[in-house]
Amino acid sequence: MVEVYARLRAAVARLAVCSAAEKDGALRAVRDALHAQREDILRANAQDLARAREAGLAAPLVARLALSEHLLEDMLRSLTVLSLQRDPIGEIIEGYTLANGLEIRKVRVPLGVVAVIYESRPNVTVDAFALAYKSGNAVLLRAGSAASYSNAPLLRAIHVGLKKAHGVVDAVAVPPVLEEKYGDVDHILRARGFIDAVFPRGGAALIRRVVEGAHVPVIETGCGVCHLYVDESANIDVALQIAENAKLQKPAACNSVETLLVHRAVARPFLHRVQEIFATCEETTRKPGGVDFFCDAESFSLLTERGARKNVFHAQAETWDREYLDYQVSVRVVPNLEEALRHIARHSTKHSEVIVTRDRARARRFHQEVDAACVYVNASSRFTDGGQFGMGAEIGVSTQKLHARGPMGLCALTTSKYLIDGEGQVRP
């Protein structure tokens, strides 16, 4: 492992003297190599999916594992977008001159060697490499075994592209397989002095393991127990449109909505129509009603008053803290905005929270009082994504408050240093 770390550290030094044009050219070459190997990538992904289903892997993990022509095109597009973005390295964040003539500049520099530990998400392989390379970092990619078939051609294409562009091939590496299960992960987490930062991407168990076991700095990407509050002043059609997008478009995403909070004044019309909309995905989910509802007493009564009971269940105490990542949703009727805010404060994972309202004062209050990385008024939580935010890609969505918060693009992979120029000044 130490030899791997040494090669990565040497790669950082080589990247430091690469021009922005050279790095951008390498990204475009990798894009072209991925495009050339797209059939191999999709065949390999099909092997991963077959193995995952045979092993009984949880549905959300299978969904995150899947690649398609459309997703591959998104990956290629993100490489193009990143290659066109301004290089953050060397940017002067601030600069000033002291009374004694010292010129001080605070400039942006790479973190150094970063490790990304992630589960069954082959797209992370490409995104993490691209963001790290563009921002002058070397990256150690520790992927979950569920995506091993998919990652092989992805990594092969990355290396082919870098070689063709005369790039820094050693800037991306994978850890060697150790005899002890998760031994490589434990080694990475203890690699103080070798690894500058670790980014975990995955479920609660993975993130907890990394955070609790790390001796190196961790930039945490948190789970998403995201809420949608439908205010009494909401345009119901807008609320329904957002609910459908935020829950059904990609339930396995961390930015999908997991809890519906509905003002009592609009609960009946909203919930009845949500029930109808969610039922349209029955063919996909192969369950009655399409989506399972876990309800407080009031919403249970409303959702069952027209006879539907097979997919409506009573909520338990732990319901409100569940990240389903599936065609399931928690529902609660609230008397006012205050109770919605209290519920969110108790159960939010500080990822993405949404209010649908036509009342500007309530919208402003929601913006101010909700403690989350992304707070939305009249828009879907599904926008919490580096690509959607115009970053090209993301290393993850940070729910912590130090260093970075929200979707993390190029700048989240940088830190700063001070450059001081003088003419012989000494401190009096």
Swiss-Prot record:
Gene Ontology MF term list: glutamate-5-semialdehyde dehydrogenase activity; NADP binding
Query: Which GO BP annotation is one of this protein's?
Result: L-proline biosynthetic process
Pathway named in the protein's UniProt entry:
Amino-acid biosynthesis; L-proline biosynthesis; L-glutamate 5-semialdehyde from L-glutamate: step 2/2
Under Enzyme Commission nomenclature, its number is 1.2.1.41
Q: Where in the cell is it found?
A: Cytoplasm
Q: What GO cellular-component annotations does this UniProt entry give?
A: cytoplasm
SS bond list: none
Task: Keywords in alphabetical order, please.
Answer: Amino-acid biosynthesis, Cytoplasm, NADP, Oxidoreductase, Proline biosynthesis
CDD domains for the chain? ALDH_F18-19_ProA-GPR
Provide the catalytic activity annotation: L-glutamate 5-semialdehyde + phosphate + NADP(+) = L-glutamyl 5-phosphate + NADPH + H(+)
Pfam annotation, one family: Aldedh
Tell me the HAMAP family matching this sequence: ProA
The family this protein is said to belong to: Belongs to the gamma-glutamyl phosphate reductase family.
Q: What is this protein called?
A: Gamma-glutamyl phosphate reductase
Naturally occurring in which organism (per UniProt) = Treponema pallidum (strain Nichols)
